[in-house]
């Protein structure tokens, strides 16, 4: 008896504990510890088919020749459940306007060349003017391969200060209602809600981490989005020209 169409053990590998309970067991997620609370993220949700009249998801060039930015975050763990995240973000048409997450992808079991090829395909569909990549681990291979066809790619070398700058920028944008994504893409909200305040191993510096077990999701879509949003400086004016972000 009962439903035998799903492999619950496999689903537990693919989702973080919070995501599993919220998406599959219909339990409400406690967001008190999250940097990005659910209420803030709900304000970013729109019906993209109704609101984004200039975006046509099924077209050969979904956004025509308007510019977009790409953010990528590599898989950090060693288990099958860990995934890399990639987002296509439309920057504001006017200063202080809204960012829109047009596409998001999570890649599991793909080597760095396959992931770089997937990013290259996005550059053939969109007018990509910026790509930001965390070069940690597998990310370094992706970064080197992307650099071959997109030399201006920005490399993020993670440390607590870089994480702080990324989160600060994203929080400023989200809290001012300057980010939009489709309401059906609940994985984006889950990803941001997984980011919590923490301290470094020495215990004397604040940083941020994703709440996850080693085999689960690690907020890849949120970090990927932050790599794209960071192309707008904290002042929200013109893009920074440095190709490597490494702050000590």
Which residues does each PLM region occupy?
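Phosphate/oxyanion-binding active-site loops and adjacent basic polyanion-contact surfaces
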Residues: 79-84, 108-115, 217-221
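Acidic two-metal-ion nuclease catalytic site recognized across multiple nuclease folds
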Residues: 104, 219, 226-248
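Structural motif
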Residues: 161-162, 211-220
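Mg2+-dependent endonuclease catalytic cores in nucleic-acid-processing enzymes, primarily RNase H-like
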Residues: 93-204
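Gly/Thr-rich phosphate-binding beta-strand-loop-beta motif of the actin/hexokinase/Hsp70
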Residues: 63-92
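ATPase catalytic-site recognition across NTP-hydrolyzing enzymes
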Residues: 1-74
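Short, flexible loop/turn elements at secondary-structure junctions
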Residues: 28, 45, 73-78, 108, ...
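Short, solvent-exposed helix-loop connector elements
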Residues: 201-215
């Amino acid at each position: 008896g009962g439903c035998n169409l799903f492999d619950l053990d496999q689903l537990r590998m693919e989702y973080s504990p919070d995501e599993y309970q919220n998406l599959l067991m219909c339990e409400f997620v406690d967001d008190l510890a999250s940097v990005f609370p659910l209420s803030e993220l709900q304000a970013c949700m729109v019906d993209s088919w109704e609101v984004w009249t200039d975006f046509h998801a099924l077209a050969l060039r979904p956004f025509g020749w308007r510019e977009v930015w790409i953010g990528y975050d590599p898989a950090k763990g060693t288990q099958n459940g860990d995934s890399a995240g990639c987002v296509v973000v439309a920057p504001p048409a006017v200063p202080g306007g809204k960012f829109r997450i047009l596409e998001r992808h999570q890649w599991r079991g793909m080597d760095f060349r396959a992931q770089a090829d997937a990013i290259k395909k996005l550059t053939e569909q969109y007018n990509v003017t910026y790509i930001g990549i965390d070069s940690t681990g597998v990310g370094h291979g992706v970064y080197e391969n992307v650099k071959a066809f997109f030399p201006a790619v920005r490399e993020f070398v993670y440390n607590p200060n870089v994480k702080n700058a990324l989160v600060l920028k994203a929080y400023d944008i989200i809290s001012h209602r300057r980010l939009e994504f489709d309401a059906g893409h609940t994985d984006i909200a889950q990803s941001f809600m997984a980011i919590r305040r923490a301290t470094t191993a020495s215990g004397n510096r604040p940083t941020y981490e994703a709440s996850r077990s080693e085999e689960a999701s690690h907020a890849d879509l949120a970090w990927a989005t932050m790599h794209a949003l960071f192309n707008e400086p904290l002042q929200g004016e013109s893009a920074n020209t440095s190709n490597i972000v490494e702050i000590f």
